[in-house]
């Protein structure tokens, strides 16, 4: 194939070309909600140059970090990130956050926040990833690799030494808010899906839908009933009786697990759309 390409400029190459979508989760939400703004950010519309949704989120996060570092409207910013502190401004927990937030913001600004810093958070947001999930991702993607570099002697010290988990949790909250503000169709879509599941769960019904290629999907998460059973075992070697406890779980097929259904509905629907897109592409290639 390569030789023919070099020798013949009119040769039609048959080698497969890998094509990657721009955050397919957001693409599906933008398309379903007919959001022209979000659709443009993930390259669903024709633009003069490719759009970069990750950079937009990074820019938003950087703006927030700079604002916190400069202690501009700090109370308002903290409450927007953690609404549960409303009415608790005199609590020790709140005062601790107010003291450490500017320090953590400065650490991230010194380290640098780019599109790669927010990319994984952006990609999993539409699949119901929450702040604690974002935090775990930042630990895996940045804190642990930085610690490994220190161990190998590649860098002198960890940029977030002694505050790795706090720094990850802090940026996770910043990224979550930035993503919500930049990609509004995703939040609206997830809210709609979860409201639908809530309504069905109230009537103890499973969620059902059909994908664009006609594949029927049923989401039915039911509760588990758990019972703890004490057992007595005789150890022949030690010649003693041992006590133990086991948990026996049995699924209740007649009661929908509302909490599990809420957390699973968005990723399940988007994954089913991803699968349909892949299958449609394969079928189209076969027809061509």
Question: Which residue ranges define each predicted feature?
Answer:
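Conserved catalytic core of nucleotide polymerization and phosphodiester-bond processing enzymes
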Residues: 1-288
């Amino acid at each position: 194939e390569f030789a023919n390409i070099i020798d013949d400029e009119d040769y039609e190459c048959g080698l497969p070309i890998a094509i990657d979508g721009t955050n397919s989760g957001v693409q599906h939400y933008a398309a379903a909600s007919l959001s022209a703004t979000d659709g443009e950010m993930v390259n669903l519309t024709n633009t003069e140059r490719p759009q970069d949704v990750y950079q937009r989120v990074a820019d938003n996060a950087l703006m927030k970090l700079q604002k916190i570092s400069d202690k501009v409207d700090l109370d308002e910013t903290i409450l927007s990130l953690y609404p549960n502190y409303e009415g608790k401004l005199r609590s020790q927990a709140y005062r601790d956050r107010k003291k450490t937030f500017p320090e953590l913001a400065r650490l991230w600004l010194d380290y640098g926040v780019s599109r790669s810093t927010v990319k994984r958070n952006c990609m999993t947001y539409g699949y119901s990833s929450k702040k604690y999930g974002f935090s775990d991702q930042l630990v895996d993607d940045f804190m642990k690799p930085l610690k490994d570099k220190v161990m190998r002697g590649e860098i002198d010290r960890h940029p977030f030494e002694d505050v790795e988990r706090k720094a990850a949790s802090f940026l996770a909250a910043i990224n979550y808010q930035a993503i919500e503000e930049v990609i509004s169709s995703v939040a609206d879509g997830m809210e709609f899906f979860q409201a639908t599941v809530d309504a069905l769960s109230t009537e103890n019904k499973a969620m059902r839908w059909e994908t664009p290629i006609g594949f029927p999907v049923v989401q039915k998460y039911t509760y588990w009933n758990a019972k703890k059973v004490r057992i007595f075992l005789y150890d022949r070697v030690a010649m003693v009786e041992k006590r133990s406890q086991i948990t026996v779980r049995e699924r209740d097929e007649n009661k929908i697990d509302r909490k599990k259904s809420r957390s699973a509905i968005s990723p399940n629907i988007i994954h089913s759309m991803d699968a349909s897109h892949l299958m449609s592409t394969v079928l189209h290639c076969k027809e061509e």
